[in-house]
Amino acid sequence: TLNNILDANPSAIMGSISANGQVFLSNPNGFIFGAGSSVNVGSLMATTAIIDSFDANTGAIVFSGNGSGTIHAMGDIEASDGYIGFFAPEIINSGSLQADAGSIALSTETNGTLYLPGFAGVGFNIDDLSSTDARSITHEGEISADGGQIIISSDAYDSALQSAINTTGMIDVSISGNGDGGNIQILAANGSIEQSGVIQANAGSNGDGGEILIIADQNLKSSGQLQAKGGTDSGDGGFIE
């Protein structure tokens, strides 16, 4: 379901949304998922860009425009069998985002072509996206993708007052049962990263630890916990950079 919303105000979701399939939401002025709100869908995409087209055969979504709005998530959002994607100049997550065995992306890039998970690759492909109005990403809540992929990416230019990415919450791609841990990427192409939360990519009983990649063009300050443990019964540790 594609919903291009042309409104002078942010779209406010204060109650519940339930859907089995993919839900695409576009509003240049942003979105507010209020405290106590609940979203349970197959997959969710919310962006301040205009969605020009979607190719169901390749999973390619073409974004245009740089909406100035913010996406602020304070509620519980769950993708039962797919992905969650937030694409806006500013993103604040103080709620819970969950996509078991799926992919979650928070990105300030809102121009170009985005490739959805399950098509050209395992997870989101944001290589062809860019932005001219990026600000920051703040993560204070919980993000989990059991054995899946989480990307937090900002190309905002770092200022003296604010890092491009600031994460104090939980980020978890550990897998339950047997299997390998997932993949986490936190990328600040033009700015700094401050990380003081817990980041986990642990294996299950039998499996290898996953991968945690944190790269900042300017400064990186990490005072939190980073874990990519191998399985409790068998398996090797993962990779942290």
Predicted regions and their residues:
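Extracellular and secretory-pathway beta-repeat/beta-biased strand scaffolds
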Residues: 1-241
